[in-house]
Amino acid sequence: MLVITRKKGESFLIGDDIEITVVKLDDGSVKLAIDAPKKLTILRKELYNEVQEENKKATNFNPSILKNIKSK
């Protein structure tokens, strides 16, 4: 893991086309601006983890519940 120290207004690059800028510093939080291509999906980690968990739940299908469905 790379740890980078930046001050307000300073940036760092990831590759050639992603720039992260420190916009605001508060007690216990940092506001970042991310300049990246539109095709790139950017998610907060907790949101990504939540989506992954919901996807796992969606794949837990019990086929025995279909026995209760009447066909015409």
From Swiss-Prot:
Keyword terms of this UniProt record: Bacterial flagellum biogenesis, Cytoplasm, Repressor, RNA-binding, Translation regulation
Location(s), subcellular: Cytoplasm
Alphabetical list of Pfam families matching this protein: CsrA (PF02599)
InterPro entries hit by this protein: CsrA, CsrA_sf
Description of how the protein assembles with itself and partners: Homodimer; the beta-strands of each monomer intercalate to form a hydrophobic core, while the alpha-helices form wings that extend away from the core.
Disulfide feature: none
Entry function: A translational regulator that binds mRNA to regulate translation initiation and/or mRNA stability. Usually binds in the 5'-UTR at or near the Shine-Dalgarno sequence preventing ribosome-binding, thus repressing translation. Its main target seems to be the major flagellin gene, while its function is anatagonized by FliW.
Subcellular location, principal: cytoplasm
Record bears the keyword Iron-sulfur: no
Family: Belongs to the CsrA/RsmA family.
Any one Gene Ontology molecular-function term assigned to this protein's record: mRNA 5'-UTR binding
Record's protein name: Translational regulator CsrA
